[in-house]
Curated annotation (Swiss-Prot):
GO CC annotation: extracellular region
Top-level taxon of the source organism: Eukaryota
GO annotation terms (biological process): cell wall organization; cellulose catabolic process; pattern specification process; response to nematode
Organism (species): Arabidopsis thaliana
UniProt keyword terms in alphabetical order: Carbohydrate metabolism, Cell wall biogenesis/degradation, Cellulose degradation, Glycosidase, Hydrolase, Polysaccharide degradation, Secreted, Signal
Protein location: Secreted
InterPro entries the record matches: 6-hairpin_glycosidase_sf (IPR008928), 6hp_glycosidase-like_sf (IPR012341), Glyco_hydro_9 (IPR001701), Glyco_hydro_9_Asp/Glu_AS (IPR033126), Glyco_hydro_9_His_AS (IPR018221)
Name of the protein described by the UniProt record: Endoglucanase 1
Enzyme class: hydrolase
Main location: secreted
Amino acid sequence: MALYLSSSRLITFLSFILLLSNGFSSSSSRPSIHHRHHLDNHNYKDALSKSILFFEGQRSGKLPPNQRMTWRSNSGLSDGSALNVDLVGGYYDAGDNMKFGFPMAFTTTMLSWSLIEFGGLMKSELPNAKDAIRWATDFLLKATSHPDTIYVQVGDPNMDHACWERPEDMDTPRSVFKVDKNNPGSDIAGEIAAALAAASIVFRKCDPSYSNHLLQRAITVFTFADKYRGPYSAGLAPEVCPFYCSYSGYQDELLWGAAWLQKATNNPTYLNYIKANGQILGADEFDNMFSWDNKHVGARILLSKEFLIQKVKSLEEYKEHADSFICSVLPGASSSQYTPGGLLFKMGESNMQYVTSTSFLLLTYAKYLTSARTVAYCGGSVVTPARLRSIAKKQVDYLLGGNPLKMSYMVGYGLKYPRRIHHRGSSLPSVAVHPTRIQCHDGFSLFTSQSPNPNDLVGAVVGGPDQNDQFPDERSDYGRSEPATYINAPLVGALAYLARS
């Protein structure tokens, strides 16, 4: 460890090593703004099971015999036919009937990362989590089966959003959109490469043939992403914006994809790529949020392990960048904002996605630091792995009900949770109960009603409360009441860790 610390940092570390159980200590540290909300201990194991079950409610395609979310039925069975390709399967991203490839790929990467770091703690839920990943990767393999072409979206978002109908009934156009060498999409291609590479690690031991198939496709897709550079939203703006525009550009996905291929292959080609292109791809730009759009922070945490554990000294800067992110989200930091009740708050719409992704990164980085027997540095202060775990736990506890409203923001967990989530399938009677088709506009009578959703989308985590810890539980409030796959994906890893501990 001392080999990679400056003398001043080594002294700082030795001075603070006895603080490992208490975390952040500094004369300049600020008092916590968190309020305590007394609740019984959370059942993280139950929450983990439900967080994985949620993905079955988002499935598109022909459902398997072991489908547990039984109010759902087959849907989207002709997806891809508009361009004579098979794009059946995959996930609906949130509460609509769209298949957006960009967030689906990120969801897949984060589910895979959750299993890579904490899958050994999942026990009986591990097969279900692998099924959730495979449902996505099977689709991503279809979407990348043609050379130098990626099918990135199924459905017309504007027409889809003008209807309120079950996925089993949808009659809106299932338009297919793609990127190719003439209309590149380095961002979505880089994310798909990351997803396939990460998933290849998950299946390496249990299904070597499938794992190798995923990895070889990841290599091909990354080559396409790097060779034909450009953001996918440049050529597909009317179709993907403002829903999933690539606001942060494509550079972060190239770094992210290379980082995952480095991890999956251990091929020096990708390490050399990162060394040569890291600065150009924004490795040292300051970011303090991690999401389906911006992967810089995730790449830094992932690459920091190469320095911390594998002792790749040329990647030391990624440990420093990872520390900078950690420092930026600590309660009391000038760049962090927390609600009066203690929830990390990044923005008004779908804030829980940042809560779950940050919590996962804190726990993952704590794992790396512990393995390397070191700490994070915030100026002259030390932040221990224990401190990072404590912050992450408080965020997850808030999500599960440790908040001023005593409300769980996970559907089906606890006694008080959102009952009117912004989700078409959940808010309309199931096909089994109401076999007659519900037409495009007919569903809006239920959309505007105050009745609870007839089908619980168990495990779904909604966008969450506002900056004052308030949550109206209104179906029309999509920013706070809509679930999404990329909210749940990193939470799976966090809950796996907490369930064990």
